[in-house]
A protein has these predicted regions:
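Hydrophobic alpha-helical membrane-insertion segments
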Residues: 39-53, 181-187, 382-390, 468-479
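Hydrophobic transmembrane alpha-helices and their helix-loop junctions in integral membrane proteins
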Residues: 97-114, 119, 123-144, 154-445
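Transmembrane helix-loop-helix hairpins at membrane boundaries of multipass inner-membrane proteins
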Residues: 1-10, 23-123, 198-206, 485
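Cytoplasmic/organellar membrane-interface segments at the starts of transmembrane helices
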Residues: 372-379, 429, 433-485
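N-terminal signal-anchor/start-transfer transmembrane helix
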Residues: 11-30, 224, 228, 289
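Short, aromatic-rich membrane-interface segments at the entry and exit
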Residues: 12, 32-38, 142-146, 278-279
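Alpha-helical transmembrane segments and their helix-start/interface "positive-inside/aromatic belt" motifs
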Residues: 30-42, 170-179, 375-381, 459-467
């Protein structure tokens, strides 16, 4: 079996296994639903890891594999490179741990949302996991669109899960805004096909400068919608109506990561990129960064604080991708690494918030005191996640933020405007550290508050997931940097 064929088979199974699991969830009685989801996600995770291992063992050669063509028109295909083989195991593996965490969370024992989990929860979540693998591996704009739309449908179903009026409104808001953004990807794909006769993302490189700029800006517009960047951010804070495991996956390794992945793939495939694309990307990133920071300052609900934090954190990625247009490969590498690193840190933080909802019946920060004494694992997880989001060494995001900032300073040597923007980013990261340090000092030490003291025991499945994610937050920074090279 050839190298390309073996990678393709592993990629296909990684996509198909969770989706087959979602069908089995619908066909079998409810008690089996969670186990089919765990099995599908586990098989998918194993395949993405095996694919990455084979890729590394062969010397990491960039590999394009056509899957479906009509005549000379490539419709669907796979791309295996350092970026896709790094991100796919993270997105799928985190999905597996979210499913495991959901088993105790989605139960009558949940103090905030007692619920007998319906099969659709596990069906949507399993489909989401498969779609993320498909999107990361896709080598065509049409393939990206297919999985782009599947993730949108899954997010609608999961955000609306509790079926309250606010949940249904939040789900519809996410669906509408991200579909408005999808128009950019549809138009970009149409332009590429009209001028090249193929949907391959690499065909963007063959367009003239004007058309290339238009296509990349359309892709950027679609990316803003999925990744909740200004002016398309408003769906994400509302999406906190979803069950917390869903919020963790949306923010850490699925919905919001779709946008940055699509834009990064377009940039790396486009050859020489017109500077207007870089300027639009970094200016919007800076506006979003400052807006997100200012908006999470007054938040007392832990999930809403983390939602606005996600908006700001993803602006770092767009800032790094924009800097790459001006010649900084270091900034591009840092942006890709930040997608990877942030996935573990933010998933951990959201799942910690969910554990408070489960055991205490609240996630309001002013009510959370003395966490370390009552829940040592949750307290350590809170601290590790907070330090990671703030970019404190040796946590993973320190390394990726450093790459982006260093790349920005290298570009800023010859461009005062960019240098100023990089300095603003540095100031924002320092302010973020100060704000999260405040909440760490308030919530973690001391005697437990009344709410914390009366809390229920932490389920073992949650503790297991926390331990794995804490380890990954610490080790994934050097891992991603060495993989991207």
């Amino acid at each position: 079996m050839s190298f390309a064929v073996s990678l393709s088979l592993l990629g296909l199974v990684a996509i198909a296994a969770p989706m087959v699991a979602s069908v089995l969830v619908a066909l079998f009685p409810r008690p089996y639903a969670k186990w089919f989801s765990v099995l599908g996600a586990a098989v998918s995770t194993a395949c993405t890891i095996a694919l990455a291992a084979n890729f590394a063992g062969a010397g990491m050669p960039d590999t394009q594999v056509p899957l479906i063509s009509f005549g000379q028109t490539l419709v669907m295909g796979f791309t295996f490179d350092r970026m896709s083989t790094l991100l796919a195991p993270a997105f799928v593996g985190i999905g597996l741990f979210v499913v495991i965490y959901s088993i105790p969370y989605m139960s009558e024992n949940n103090r905030e949302h007692p619920d007998a989990p319906r099969r659709r929860f596990y069906a949507y979540l399993a489909t989401f996991i498969g779609a993320m693998a498909g999107l990361v591996y896709s080598s065509t704009l049409l393939g990206q669109l297919v999985f782009f739309e599947i993730t949108g449908a899954c997010s609608w179903g999961l955000i609306s899960y509790y079926m309250s009026p606010t949940a249904k409104k939040a789900g519809m808001k996410a669906l509408i805004i991200t579909h408005i953004g999808a128009l950019g990807l549809y138009l970009g794909a149409a332009i590429v096909f009209a001028h090249t006769g193929t949907f391959a993302i690499t065909a963007i490189a063959g367009l003239d400068a004007k058309l290339k700029a238009i296509v990349l800006l359309l892709v950027l517009f679609a990316a803003w919608a999925k990744s909740a960047q200004a002016p398309m951010y408003m769906w994400l804070p509302s999406a906190m109506e979803a069950p917390t495991p869903v919020s963790a996956y949306l923010h850490g390794a699925s919905m919001v990561k779709v946008g940055v992945c699509v834009f990064a793939r377009a940039l790396v495939s486009a050859g020489e990129v017109p500077e207007i694309v870089g300027w639009v990307a970094i200016i919007d990133a800076m506006v979003t960064m400052l807006f997100g920071f200012l908006m999470y300052l007054p938040q007392k609900d832990m999930k809403r604080l983390l939602a606005f934090s996600t908006i700001a954190q993803l602006s770092y990625v767009f800032f790094g991708l924009g800097l790459s247009v001006f010649g900084s490969q270091l900034a591009f590498d840092g942006a890709v690494c930040h997608i990877f690193n942030h996935a573990f840190a933010k998933t951990l933080f959201f799942l910690i918030a969910g554990s408070f909802s489960f055991t205490l019946g609240t996630r309001m920060l002013p009510k959370l005191r003395g966490i370390v004494k009552k829940y040592p694992i949750s307290g350590v997880g809170f601290g590790v996640a907070a330090l990671a989001i703030a970019g404190v060494p040796p946590m993973n995001t320190f390394f990726s933020k450093f790459q982006i900032i260093a790349g920005g300073f290298s570009v800023g040597v010859g461009n005062v405007a960019i240098l100023v923007l990089v300095c603003i980013m540095v100031a924002e990261t320092v302010a973020t550290f100060a704000w999260f340090l405040k909440w760490m000092g308030y919530c973690l030490p001391g005697e437990p508050s009344e709410e914390v003291a009366a809390g229920a025991p932490l389920p073992r499945a949650m503790a297991f997931v926390f331990i794995v994610l804490i380890i990954m937050v610490i080790v994934s920074g050097p891992l991603s940097a060495s993989w991207i090279g």
